[in-house]
Every structure is written in structure tokens, then in C-alpha cells.
Amino acid sequence: MALEVRRMEGDVEDGELSDSDSDMPGAGSPRERQQKSNDGSNAGRPFQSSISSGVPDVPYRTTKSVDSSDESFSESDDDSSLWKRKRQKCFNFPPAKCEPFPLNQSHAKQTALGGKKVNNIWGMVLQEQNQDAVATELGILGMDGSIDRSRQSETYNYLLAKKLMKEAQQKEAETLDKELDEYMHDDKKTLPAEEENGQGFLKRKRSVKDRLGERQEMKYKGRYEITEEDSEEKVADEIAYRLCEPKKDLIARVVKIIGKRKAIELLMETAEVEQNGGLFIVNGTRRRTPGGVYLNLLKNTPSIKEEQIKEIFYLENQKEYENKKAAKKRRIQVLGKKMKKAIKGLNLQEYDDASRETFASDTNEALASLDDLQDGHHEAKMEHEDIIEIDNAHDLEIF
């Protein structure tokens, strides 16, 4: 057997490979047959796996290990098999397994079900929250979305966070509205004695319903008929009753200045206007009261002179002027108290001497002017040119 092998090797030229292993059945050992089967399986691997292994290229007829019997046989003839022995020492490492990249979600699920836990936390979070978002859009989410709490501090539900932020903003807005209402309500809580003394806070102008009450309809059928022969007091009292006008002295001045006949004619015109729907005020927000309609017709009647109208409303305009002056004085008094309180809380040591002196002089002048306004009790009466015309007698009640 050895002589045949040598003879065949002698026939092979340098650089050629011997096919003795394929021509001679049974010549190889079981280890060599196993190596052949391994070579066959390696040849069927994907081309991508062989590239990604990163090992240098080797001839395909190489063996993984050298058998001791083969080494002893090859050592007997060093000259003929030296090149073969060197080539047998090259090892063919098995290429590393390179799994293809999962292109779809089903592959990832299969990998996760295979026993290996995939560390894809944010992918799971995104999937859960997308499901919650879809359920919310469909309107089938009647409760808070359940989220996996196994991640503890890494758990974050952006839908729940948005809901909580919205609730916090609504709560803050309600709190601000409540504080504003309390502030406005406290502003109106002033005692009458303090208002008379000018020591209370300003009271805001009341609404129309608070000042005028519910609108009363005109009483078309009075208590009795009135004529020019009746006295002025009787005519004025009946007109005030039918108009539901509380200011009877104003109606009495109207009857006295323009006469009983003209006053009764204006009453009939007022009844006709009220039956047709009434009159609106200038801005159109509400209808005039029957007394307001009566006074409006009085001012717009050409036969009534302007001097007569000024004489009728002189006392009312004078009261309104005094009320405005008193309101202005009260505002100045409240402002002075706030200024004094603010000055006491200032720390003027932080500024230089010149700034402190200037501030002190300006403050003293302002406080002195406030004291002068508070001490002055004499009010000059208005001239006829300063009289303010009004549309409704009820609008004179400012406070």
C-alpha cells in the first residue's frame, strides 16, 4: 500500500493535487470521512456568512486537524510530502453564525417567544401607547389605559400625562376665577357708615337690575281720570303712579314748569309708545322704563324750550355732579391710604441721599394735596353751562 502511494505521488507533478483520497475507497480514516462531510456542509453555507466571518481565504481541500497516523506516515518521506504537510497545518475555522436582520415584526415576536428576551423597551412602550391612542379615537376607551408597570421608573404614559396636565390647567383657571370673584365680592362689602365718612373702599357701580330692579310695566288704567281742572299735586301724583316713577318731585317739577295740559299729553304719548314696544336706550342694550320714555319725549318735544328743560333737571344734575365729586374724593382718599402703606414698606437706605430727598419731597407734596382735598368740604355749585342732561331719572343713582 505504501509503495502504491509513493508511486502515485511520484507521477504527480509539482503544484498538482493528488486525487488519491477520492480514487481509493476506504483508504481514509473515519476522521477523514467526517472531515469530508463537514467540508460538504460548509460548502452549502450562504455566501453572506462566509464573507461576514472575516477569516482569510483557504483552499477548499484542507483538514481541520492532522491524525497521528498520517503524521507518522508522512514523516517517513520528508522530501515528497513536505509541501502537503505544511498545507495540512492550515486550519479552517468554522465561520461565525450571522443571523439576518429581522425585517418584519413577526420575526421579532418569534425571536422573543423562542426564549431570548429582546431588550426593546421603547418599542413596547410605543406599541402600547399606539393601541391606547387608537382606542381613544374610536371612542371605546371608557377608563384609563392600563400600562405595564414592570419597568417602574421607565414607565411613561403620555396620554395620561396630557390628561393630568389638562386637569391641572383647568384647576388653576378655576382657582384664579374664584380668587377674582372673592376679590370683587370683598370690594363691594362696605359699611354705609364708612362710606359716609369716606373711610370705606370704593363700591363698584351696581348693575341695572340692582339699581333699577325688575322692569315694571306702565299702568295704562290709573286710579282716576285727570284733567286740566285738577290740581298740580293730583296730576303729578297720578302721572307718577301710572309711570311707576319713584321720583315724584321730578314729575311735580315737570307739571309745574310745562303745565298740566302738556304733562297729560306727554303721558298719553308715553302710553302709545309703550304699547308699541317701548324705546331702547342709546347703546341698545335694554328698553327704557316708562319714566325714561316720558322724560325722553319731554326733551324731544319742540314746543318745550331748552331753558325749561334745564330748569327741570337742574337739581337732578346738581346731585349727580356732587355724587361724582364725592366719588372722586373717595378714590383719592383710598389712593392716599395705599400710598402711605406702600411708603412705610419701602427701604430707602438702598438709595443715595439725593434720590431719598427727591422721593421724600415728591411724596410730601402728594400727601399734602391729598390732605387738602380731604379737608375741603365746600363745593362750588355748577353753572348752567355745566349741567349734564340725562335720559333716565333712575340713572342718577350711581352708588
UniProtKB/Swiss-Prot annotation:
Chain spans, region Disordered? 1-83
Any Pfam family the entry gives: PHAX_RNA-bd
Location(s) in or outside the cell: Nucleus; Cytoplasm
Compositionally biased residues, Polar residues:
37-53
Composition-biased stretches, type Acidic residues, lie in 11-22, 68-80
Mark out the compositionally biased spans (Basic and acidic residues): 1-10
User: What is the gene called?
Assistant: PHAX
Query: Matching Gene3D superfamilies, A to Z?
Result: PHAX RNA-binding domain
GO annotations of cellular component type: cytoplasm; nucleus
Q: What is this protein called?
A: Phosphorylated adapter RNA export protein
**Highest taxon of the source?**
Eukaryota
Q: Which residues form the signal peptide?
A: none
Q: Which GO terms describe its molecular function?
A: RNA binding
Family from the record: Belongs to the PHAX family.
Query: From its record, what is one biological process in GO terms?
Result: snRNA export from nucleus
PANTHER family to which the protein is assigned, alphabetical: CYTOSOLIC RESINIFERATOXIN BINDING PROTEIN RBP-26, PHOSPHORYLATED ADAPTER RNA EXPORT PROTEIN
Alphabetical keyword list: Cytoplasm, Nucleus, Protein transport, RNA-binding, Transport
Described purpose of this protein according to its UniProt entry: Probably involved in protein and RNA export from the nucleus.
Q: Give the organism the record lists.
A: Gallus gallus (Chicken)
